[in-house]
Curated annotation (Swiss-Prot):
Keywords: ATP-binding, Cell cycle, Cell division, DNA damage, DNA recombination, DNA repair, DNA replication, Ligase, Magnesium, Metal-binding, Nucleotide-binding. The keyword Manganese does not apply. InterPro entries: ATP-dep_DNA_ligase, DNA_ligae_ATP-dep_bac/arc, DNA_ligase_ATP-dep, DNA_ligase_ATP-dep_C, DNA_ligase_ATP-dep_cent, DNA_ligase_ATP-dep_CS, DNA_ligase_ATP-dep_N, DNA_ligase_N_sf. GO terms for molecular function: ATP binding; DNA binding; DNA ligase (ATP) activity; metal ion binding. Its cofactor is Mg(2+). The gene is lig. GO terms for biological process: cell division; DNA biosynthetic process; DNA recombination; DNA repair; lagging strand elongation. This is DNA ligase. DNA ligase that seals nicks in double-stranded DNA during DNA replication, DNA recombination and DNA repair. Signal peptide: none annotated. It comes from Saccharolobus islandicus (strain Y.G.57.14 / Yellowstone #1) (Sulfolobus islandicus). ATP binds at D258, R265, R280, E310, F350, R427, K433. It catalyses: ATP + (deoxyribonucleotide)n-3'-hydroxyl + 5'-phospho-(deoxyribonucleotide)m = (deoxyribonucleotide)n+m + AMP + diphosphate.
Length: 601
């Protein structure tokens, strides 16, 4: 299969703003792809060489070295490449222009013919894999030579998307949900197969692996798919409410209640003597927690399992829980073994999804928890999450206050009926989080995605000083604007923000972004931030839940304030539009709705 095919489709995808058109075009590309390398094609579409959970290195080519590779490939002076880049702001477009110029001025371009062999997807994939995996002395020069070799063979359009791929900036607007829908259309006979494909992906979060199974065994093979140790399961997510009485009613009157820990959620896989740890974002974080690997090996029973818990920093003297920030301090230390001494951790387990070749995601919580409790040996490091079974408001409140007093964020209230399965990749009312109220009318913080930026005035003139934030709509796989946040940033954070945003700047709005507001710059929906505000209000300026509460208006956050970046969350993990609507419906209503506030004022 020629790489040119992918490049031509990327060129078309980049110009589309409709998700339906995006999905249809992507389905067309998949159906025309070589089935033998369909997994590689899918990874390239995702802008990666392999799934994040494998923990393999990324390409590791910086701007400076890309400029050098383009210079070598196009026989152009490095300064000229750099000046053109400063003028255009897109290295991929720089490569395309220089390759076009090279072709038109060469003798082959004059004759209107070419003798070079076409660039194959396999060659691109294997060469870029070498670039990523090459280490040691002289590795930088080798990486540049390998990349320059590919760019020499590439035509202008191929060069454009090769460079963007290496930069990690494909800009074609494709999310995992769009790829899933396209796979259902291309290989499953239509959109009706989407649920089957999505379920498989939720159990094995590897789109390339799912695509390979479909083309080799057919869509029916996905119906019996089980979790596989080494491939993370997409985590089950909780809804949120701030009223204990309403929570208990939602889960059927009785529930299992766990502490909600202020730590890092971890999915732990074991097969024989191999142990893997995956983050909430399904990244391989095993190397960050050699102590946890040791604890799981020593204090759990079973040859093969997938379990879930929270890694929490604890005081080395008292054993009391420390905050999430302490865990972040540990991660920043270069000497991991020194970090283990300074910031020890405990693991609090709360679920079991797979054990000895049996899929437990379809079994009720009580069955899963009972088995989980039976495989943990008595010890001081790996424990079952603090929990209680409740059937009345008083016990729920009492346990909630106890959790807060012991350093927790609140509690997770979990349904215990026969239908209380593990809903991989889904957010539902089987789990509901109850967190302490903030000193604000909003009952909880929200996690929103940056989709644009606005330049400041006065001392902040010339700098991006406020952000257009969006909530995630999983039904449409889009990001709907919900507020413009300008407060809460330190000067240092603002300086860091300029670089962050310029790296993901776009010329036009991302096709997955739904916004009436026009920021000064559009960006890729990559970064997630935790935001607090005074209340959720109706606003004609924003598209979150457009026309749901009031015609021609959406929902917005009044007086939003930045709290922190949520690097542990992907854009699709952000607060959903339905959650924003739920929070709006649950907040105390005034007799007259406050008039919409323009956050830019």
């Amino acid at each position: 299969m020629e790489f040119k095919v992918i490049a031509e489709y990327f060129d078309k995808l980049e110009k589309i703003s409709s998700r339906l058109q995006l999905t249809a075009l992507l389905a067309d590309l998949l159906s025309k792809s070589d089935k033998a390398i369909i997994d590689k094609v899918v990874y390239i579409i995702q802008g990666k060489l392999w799934p994040d959970f494998l923990g393999y290195p990324e390409l590791g080519i910086g701007e400076k070295f890309l400029i050098k590779a383009i210079s070598i490939a196009t026989n152009t002076d490095e300064n000229s490449v750099e000046n053109l880049y400063k003028s255009i702001g897109d290295l991929g477009e720089v490569a395309r222009r220089l390759k076009s110029k090279q072709q038109s001025t060469g003798i082959l371009g004059f004759l209107g013919t070419s003798s070079k062999e076409s660039l194959k997807v396999d060659e691109v994939y294997s060469t870029l894999s070498k670039v990523a995996l090459t280490t040691g002395e002289g590795s930088r020069d080798l990486k540049i030579r390998l990349l320059a070799g590919l760019l020499k063979k590439a035509d202008p359009l191929e060069a454009k998307f090769l460079v963007r791929f290496v930069e990690g900036r494909l800009r074609v607007g494709i999310g995992d949900a769009t790829v899933l829908d396209a796979m259902a259309i291309a290989f499953g006979g239509g959109q009706s197969a989407s649920e089957i494909v999505e379920r498989a992906y939720n159990l094995r979060a590897d789109l390339g692996n799912i695509a390979k199974i479909i083309v080799e065994k057919g869509i029916e093979a996905l119906k019996t798919l089980k979790p596989e140790v080494g491939i993370p399961i997409r985590p089950m997510l909780a809804e949120r409410l701030s009223n204990p009485e309403e929570i208990l009613k939602k889960v059927g009157g009785s529930a299992l209640v766990d502490y909600k820990y202020d730590g890092e959620r971890a999915q732990i896989h074991k097969k024989d003597d191999k142990i893997f740890i995956f983050s909430r974002r399904l990244e391989n974080i095993t190397s960050q927690y050699p102590d946890v690997v040791e604890y799981i090996s020593k204090y759990t029973e079973g040859k093969e399992f997938i379990i879930e818990g929270e890694i929490v920093a604890v005081d080395p003297e008292s054993g009391e829980m420390r905050s999430f920030q302490e865990l972040m301090h540990r991660k920043r230390k270069s000497d991991i073994y020194e970090a283990i001494k300074e910031y020890p951790v405990n693991v609090f387990l709360f679920d079991l999804m797979y054990y000895e070749d049996v899929d437990y995601t379809t079994k009720p919580l009580e069955v899963r928890r009972k088995l989980l409790e039976s495989i943990v040996k008595p010890n001081d490091y790996v424990k079952i999450a603090h929990h209680i079974q409740v059937n009345n408001i008083e016990d729920l409140k009492s346990f909630f206050y106890r959790a807060i007093s012991e350093g927790g964020e609140g509690v997770m209230v979990k349904a215990i009926g026969k239908d209380a399965i593990y809903q991989a990749g889904a957010r539902g009312w089987l789990w509901i989080k109850l967190k302490r109220d903030y000193q604000s009318e909003m009952a909880d913080t929200v996690d929103l995605v940056v989709v644009g930026g606005f330049y400041g005035k006065g001392k902040r003139g010339g700098k991006i000083s406020s952000l257009l934030m969006a909530a995630y709509n999983p039904k449409t796989d889009t990001f709907e604007s919900v507020c413009k946040v300008a407060s809460g940033f330190s000067d240092e954070q603002l300086d860091e923000l300029q670089k962050k945003l310029m790296e993901i700047k776009r010329d036009i709005k991302h096709p997955r972004v739904n916004s009436k507001m026009e920021p000064d710059i559009w960006v890729e929906p990559v970064y997630v931030a935790e935001i607090i505000g005074a209340e959720i209000t109706i606003s004609p300026l924003h598209t979150c839940c457009q026309d749901v509460v009031e015609k021609d208006a959406g929902l917005s956050i009044r007086f939003p304030r930045f709290i922190r970046w949520r690097d542990d969350k992907s854009p699709e993990d952000a607060t959903t539009t339905d959650e924003i609507l739920e929070m709006y419906n649950k907040q105390p209503k005034k007799k007259i709705e406050s008039p919409p506030i323009d956050e830019s004022v």
